[in-house]
């Protein structure tokens, strides 16, 4: 009881497959779920006690195994068959029935020895009476078939009785038959070794006695069954042996086994048993038509004998068991494979049609994404997206970048949503600009100095006025006496501070004036009393109104004798600027910067206007402001002039401006004094940035340098993506335009200046010179001196270098001379613009213009051999030159145009003939000259093309 065994171990001992053993266990009522299930000794004994059920199961599942066992019993009969020679099937049946009860125990041991021998039909004759050897082989087969029928009624006892019958009948067995028996036994062991073990166990326990009793009770039935079975079995074996592939048909024949009685003589008693046994024995034995043929004709049986005998030998080698297993298991495997093959494509189609959840149909992208990446995230083929974009009129490729708006529209076509998850620098800057000590409430804000921008037309005295206020001389330091930089200054007036921004008045510095108007609180519009309103004056008014900044008009140069302030006021009324004394709200102050008159009144008006505006700021926040100007200093690096608008900027604060970031290393005011901190409305020069920021950009002080770097890196990446997106977009029209531009001349320039604002001014002024015939392309701009990299770039791109208020390094100058690069230096923007205009005009091809010289009238023609027609002419106007071009006109229609071949006067060659003289001339390669024709004389001259 204590010893247990697993199913697979028991199967190995019994030589049976795990599946077969599991089926036997289930039929025996033993619960075993898998090959790893544990069986007790009681279960094993229970399995041994139910051999009949196991045999029946084996007959259904493994037909080959059951057939072989019974065939093994047949060879024992075959041993007795050689002496018997009866051919009648009825006698065979009776003999078997009589001998069965006599020897029931012996057949059990003989069953494993029985082998299926080729001639089944002869066995019937052997049982009835001794006959020739070939016939004896046939009855052996018949007995084997009879056994399964007996087993159907009584499982093992029937087999035992049959074996006994076989032993009684045989007198002597042939040696070759005995040799075949062991081979069949080996096959039966391989396929159904369990059945033999179960039979031996049953015999040892005494089941043989019970079998004898059951057999004796059913003797008449057994006899009929054996007779029928003998016939059927012999025929079945022949068919199986002759055609091994027909084993699949055996099952069919077994199901139709009731048809066999048609050809069998003893159909009375055994017929019903054959039907009962058919479901079990039908599986092991082949169909009925084969036995019918044997009964009807011996010739067919003999043919079947020979073929089946040879094949039986082949089957006896051990292939039979394998084929039986294949019949049982392989069809199921094939069906499974076919099922799997059919099912596999279905889930694939379903996955294509499946719709993801709504939350999964949201695609998060940055500002720009490529077509391929968008298709990958959407799970859509790239070609589908490209097709949709082409339908919308965009010619793209898989690597084409899409902006957020285009991606959103495209994704909506495929039922997807696009969410922009780009780095939100505004939130970061808003968080870092949080109040450190006090909130943005009224209590935390304090009055701040006003920011005043001085604007006006060039040479109207803006800088001179600021110099008079600051008591300095800025104009003297400017090249050409005009301001070319934007300056920020801090002035104290009656213990109050005013921040002044001085902007250039030249037309090239429009962007500077626009920046000055944006960051200012009050605008002082300077108008010369002797000039009145000029173009830049109008522009300054427009900038101020666009920024919503109040304007104070300063009428300058009142010291001149031709000054007329009323004319200025009258002209400004056109721009809705009416003086207060005329009932308006615009403040007018008449000043003289040269004589420093009425400056206090101007400053008083500025402070009054600032009080009205109630300018306040919170100094307790992180600093925020604007870049007024930026330049590259050789000793200090990038230097930025900043105007703090909110908060307080301190040394060491990390700041970010445009594409650059860094920590504040030093701060100095306009007088060169070092500062530790700068409050609202305080202009300072800052060093420590990674590069020169663009003038007009805003700057922010952030919490850490890491945040500053993150913001700057994000901006740089965004700029690169936008450049890539802009350069890759091109339509067919643009492509055609570019092809046409192949004939357009280009002048490439590199601009280097001392400050960023000057770079922008020079660039904008030069770009305006571009025309359809000649275009100016600025390939590089930077702040600082001209270095070797600039020269190398110019050499590679055939460009010229313009230096504005900068000089070239010694190595760069030497390299430029070697490479033949043209470097030009300027201090005044006028000179740079004029020189570039001349250079662009030099690139253009000269224009050809026709110059009229005179007219002649043909009065006579002469024909000279080998020369042609000579026209005698009279010069009616102008003159005729020998190498001039002429045009022959007849009846006001141009007949011919070409050159003069010769020009003579009185047989002498003439260089020219003046008006009122006669001459003779001939045309080059043309002789159809008639009297009355008019010849026009002209020449083509080249004229320089201007922009």
From Swiss-Prot:
Gene Ontology CC, one term: cytosol
GO function terms (MF aspect): GTP binding; GTPase activity; translation initiation factor activity
InterPro entries linked to this entry: EF-G-like_DII (IPR053905), EFTu-like_2 (IPR004161), IF2_II (IPR044145), IF2_N (IPR006847), P-loop_NTPase (IPR027417), Small_GTP-bd (IPR005225), T_Tr_GTP-bd_dom (IPR000795), TF_IF2_bacterial-like (IPR000178)
Low complexity bias (residue ranges): 81-108, 264-284
Region (G3) location: 502-505
Region annotation (Disordered) ranges: 69-353
Biological role stated in the UniProt entry: One of the essential components for the initiation of protein synthesis. Protects formylmethionyl-tRNA from spontaneous hydrolysis and promotes its binding to the 30S ribosomal subunits. Also involved in the hydrolysis of GTP during the formation of the 70S ribosomal complex.
Record-linked HAMAP family: IF_2_B
Name assigned to this protein: Translation initiation factor IF-2
The organism of origin for this protein: Syntrophotalea carbinolica (strain DSM 2380 / NBRC 103641 / GraBd1) (Pelobacter carbinolicus)
Originating gene: infB
């Amino acid at each position: 009881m204590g010893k247990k065994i697993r199913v697979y171990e028991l199967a190995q001992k019994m030589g049976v497959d795990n599946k077969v053993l599991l089926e036997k266990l289930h039929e025996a009522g033993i619960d075993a779920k898998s090959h790893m299930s544990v069986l007790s000794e009681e279960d094993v004994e229970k399995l041994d006690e139910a051999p009949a059920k196991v045999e029946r199961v084996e007959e259904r599942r493994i037909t080959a195994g059951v057939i072989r066992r019974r065939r093994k019993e047949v060879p024992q009969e075959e041993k007795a068959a050689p002496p018997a020679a009866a051919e009648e099937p009825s006698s065979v049946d009776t003999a078997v029935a009589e001998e069965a009860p006599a020897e029931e125990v012996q057949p059990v041991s003989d069953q494993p020895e029985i082998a299926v021998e080729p001639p089944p039909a002869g066995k019937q004759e052997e049982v009835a009476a001794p006959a020739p050897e070939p016939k004896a082989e046939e009855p052996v087969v018949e007995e084997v078939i009879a056994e399964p029928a007996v087993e159907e009624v009584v499982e093992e006892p029937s087999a035992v009785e049959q074996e006994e019958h076989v032993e009684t009948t045989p007198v002597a067995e042939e040696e070759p038959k005995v040799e075949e028996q062991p081979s069949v036994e080996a096959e039966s062991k391989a396929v159904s070794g369990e059945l033999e073990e179960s039979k031996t166990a049953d015999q040892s326990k005494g089941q043989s006695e019970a079998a004898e009793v059951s057999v004796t009770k059913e003797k008449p039935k057994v006899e009929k069954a054996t007779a029928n079975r003998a016939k059927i079995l012999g025929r079945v074996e022949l068919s199986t042996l002759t055609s091994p592939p027909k084993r699949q048909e055996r099952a069919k024949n077994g199901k139709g086994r009731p048809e066999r009685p048609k050809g069998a003589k003893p159909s009375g008693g055994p017929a019903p048993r054959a039907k009962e046994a058919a479901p079990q024995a039908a599986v092991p034995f082949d169909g009925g038509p084969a036995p019918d043929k044997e009964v009807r004709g011996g010739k067919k049986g003999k043919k079947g004998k020979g073929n089946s005998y040879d094949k039986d030998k082949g089957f006896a080698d051990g292939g039979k068991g394998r084929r039986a297993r294949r019949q049982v298991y392989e069809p199921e495997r094939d069906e499974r494979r076919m099922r799997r093959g059919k099912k596999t494509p279905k889930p694939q189609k379903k996955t294509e049609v499946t719709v993801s959840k709504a939350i999964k149909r949201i695609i998060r992208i940055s500002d720009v994404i490529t077509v391929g990446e968008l298709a990958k995230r959407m799970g859509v083929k790239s070609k589908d997206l490209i097709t949709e974009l082409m339908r919308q009129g965009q010619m793209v490729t898989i690597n084409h970048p899409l902006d957020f708006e285009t991606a959103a529209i495209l994704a909506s076509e495929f039922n997807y949503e696009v969410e922009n998850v780009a780095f939100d620098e505004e939130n970061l800057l808003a968080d870092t600009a949080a109040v450190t000590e006090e909130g943005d409430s009224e209590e935390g804000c304090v009055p701040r100095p006003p920011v005043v921008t001085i604007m006006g037309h060039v040479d109207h005295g803006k800088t001179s006025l600021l110099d008079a206020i600051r008591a300095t001389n800025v104009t003297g330091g400017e090249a050409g006496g005009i301001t070319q930089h934007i300056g920020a200054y801090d002035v104290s007036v009656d213990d109050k501070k005013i921040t002044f921004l001085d902007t250039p008045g030249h037309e090239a510095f429009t962007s500077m004036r626009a920046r000055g108007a944006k960051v200012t609180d009050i605008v002082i519009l300077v108008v010369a009393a002797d000039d009145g309103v000029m173009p830049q004056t109008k522009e300054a008014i427009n900038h101020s109104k666009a920024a919503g900044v109040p304007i104070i008009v300063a009428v300058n140069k009142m010291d001149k004798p031709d000054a007329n302030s009323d004319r200025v006021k009258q002209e400004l009324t056109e721009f809705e600027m009416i003086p207060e004394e005329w009932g308006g709200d615009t403040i007018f102050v008449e000043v003289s910067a040269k004589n420093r008159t009425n400056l206090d009144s101007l400053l008083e008006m500025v402070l009054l206007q600032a009080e009205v505006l109630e300018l306040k700021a919170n100094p307790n926040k992180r600093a925020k402001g604007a870049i007024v100007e930026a330049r590259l200093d050789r000793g200090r690096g990038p230097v930025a002039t900043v105007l703090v608008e909110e908060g307080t900027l301190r040394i060491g604060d990390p700041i970010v401006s445009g594409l650059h970031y860094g920590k504040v290393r030093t701060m100095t005011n306009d007088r060169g004094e070092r500062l530790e901190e700068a409050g609202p409305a305080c202009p300072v020069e800052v060093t420590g940035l990674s590069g020169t920021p663009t003038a007009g950009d805003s700057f922010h002080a952030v919490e850490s340098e890491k945040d500053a770097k993150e913001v700057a890196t994000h901006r740089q990446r965004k700029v690169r993506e936008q450049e890539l997106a802009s350069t890759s977009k091109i339509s067919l029209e643009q492509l055609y335009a570019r092809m046409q531009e192949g004939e357009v001349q280009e002048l490439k320039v590199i601009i280097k200046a001392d400050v960023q604002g000057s770079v922008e001014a020079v660039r904008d002024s030069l770009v305006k010179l571009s025309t359809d015939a000649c275009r100016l392309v600025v390939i590089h701009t930077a702040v600082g001196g001209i270095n070797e990299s600039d020269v190398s770039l110019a050499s590679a791109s055939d460009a010229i270098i313009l230096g504005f208020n900068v000089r070239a390094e010694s190595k760069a100058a030497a390299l430029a001379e070697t490479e033949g690069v043209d470097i030009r230096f300027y201090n005044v923007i006028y000179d740079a613009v004029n020189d570039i205009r001349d250079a662009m005009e030099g690139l253009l091809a000269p224009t050809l213009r026709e110059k009229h010289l005179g007219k002649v009238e043909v009065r006579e023609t002469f024909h000279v051999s080998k020369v042609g027609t000579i026209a005698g002419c009279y010069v009616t106007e102008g003159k005729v030159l020998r190498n001039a071009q002429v045009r022959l006109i007849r009846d006001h229609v141009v007949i011919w145009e070409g050159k003069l071949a010769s020009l003579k006067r009185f047989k002498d060659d003439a260089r020219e003939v003046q008006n009122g003289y006669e001459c003779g001339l001939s045309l080059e390669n043309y002789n159809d000259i008639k009297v009355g024709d008019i010849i026009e004389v002209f020449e083509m001259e080249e004229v320089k093309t201007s922009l």
